[in-house]
Amino acid sequence: LHGRYADLQDGQVADYIPELAKADPDWFGICIATRDGHVYEVGDTRQVFTIQSISKALSYGLALEDRGEDFILSRVGVEPSGEAFNAISLKPETGAPFNPMINAGAIATCGQILEPSDQTRIQRILDYLSACAGRRLDVDAAVYQSESETGHRNRAIGWMLRNFGILNEEPTEVLETYFQQCAIRVTCRDLAVMGATLANQGRNPLTRELAVNPEVVDNVLSVMSTCGMYDFSGEWIYRVGLPAKSGVGGGILAVLPGQLGIGIFSPPLDAQGNSARGIKVCGDLSRDLALHQFANGSAPTPSLRLSYTGSQVTSCRRRPLTIQQTLRASGHRIRVHELQGELIF
């Protein structure tokens, strides 16, 4: 796959944030991390870039943990908007953003994260994302400064949220935290491990640390499924069928729940703001490996090969005489099932 799309010239590197325009359009990495801790990677998987909007999915999880589902749903919806990620639009009846994956929803979400006396919000967000990645992450100061200096549209969104009471404080500090959150430095490998952490019900498969509360993982993956790929989300779930989140830094994080996480990095973006190579790679992976969540697959075959009692077989292991006597006397109470194939419950 890497060789297939390395020469693809589609897309343009984001330039509305000056620091992002410095990215090399030839950078290209693919990484898959499984829930049991195996990592497979090719290309520029250790090249550092900024996480951008991919951070929205995980900060949403942190806000859910802090405030609870009912409170967050009263401030941020979960409906696809069908609009651009930076649209200045809120629900007319409530003033709430449509979902946490667009800028308005992410800024509102950021403002709900608790800030204890001994930690700032960005420190808590960094701790959370670092636990998901399995290593200590930091903020790219130059990108943060660039985002802050050009973030006039996001400031307009912030003041609208304050006007409707979605933010209960002046938006200036919340916005600076949001700009820093988007400027967190990651690699393609980090994204894959983050995805595998979500696939593994919140437990990082490399460090074994419980990074995300399992109670919010399904909520995060659900919103990623319906809203994670900007205004391409409908076609994405139709063709690829995986919860995912993209960022204008060129990253894509995708998750096959219960199985694996996928991280892709390639800076040139398509018209919707998604990595052009990343979209192609994910489509091929989904098709070639049958990863689509809603694919029926082939007709299931019976998984039960044999069924018998313990009295019908003898143990190959050398055991003390007393245990042998117990097994002979009680073998009929042991049921052995030999299974092979896919188990569907």
Model-derived features with residue positions:
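Active-site SXXK
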Residues: 36-37, 50-72, 194, 262
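Short Gly/Pro-enriched turn/cap motifs at secondary-structure boundaries
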Residues: 20-23, 98-99, 149, 183, ...
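The feature marks cytosolic C-terminal regulatory regions of anion transporters and related permeases
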Residues: 292-345
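Conserved SxxK-family serine transpeptidase/carboxypeptidase catalytic domain
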Residues: 206-279, 284, 288-314
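Active-site-proximal alpha-helical segments within enzyme catalytic domains
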Residues: 57, 185-204, 219, 256-267
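A short, well-structured edge-of-sheet supersecondary motif
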Residues: 5-42, 253-254
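A short acidic/small-residue loop/turn micro-motif
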Residues: 46-48
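Active-site-adjacent helix/loop patches that line small-molecule binding or acyl-intermediate pockets
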Residues: 1-3, 8-10, 63-181, 189, ...
